[in-house]
Amino acid sequence: MNPANYLYLSALLFTIGASGVLLRRNAIVMFMCVELMLNAVNLAFVTFARMHGHLDGQMIAFFTMVVAACEVVVGLAIIMTIFRTRKSASVDDANLLKG
């Protein structure tokens, strides 16, 4: 398959994720859209690494996935705390984290 197709797919996935973050108010859906955006960037990194014959893009994608896994743990813990206290996963209820 042509590497340009992977880049088009990456751009499409990033656009879908960005529109989901901007248009949705549910924290879990927004969280999934951010993860979709990260995976789109990882696909672009791996595609560019494959095109140029280097492993740098693949290493960056690997470390991005490691950081994303840590982000999932912390993010879901915060979302579950908000859901337990407010009985809603709306980002409008996130003001309870203010000091």
UniProtKB/Swiss-Prot annotation:
The chain crosses the membrane at residues 3-23, 28-48, 59-79. It catalyses: a quinone + NADH + 5 H(+)(in) = a quinol + NAD(+) + 4 H(+)(out). One of its GO terms (molecular function) is quinone binding. It comes from the Bacteria. It is found in: Cell membrane. NCBIfam families: PRK05715.1-2 (NF004320), PRK05715.1-3 (NF004321). This is NADH-quinone oxidoreductase subunit K.
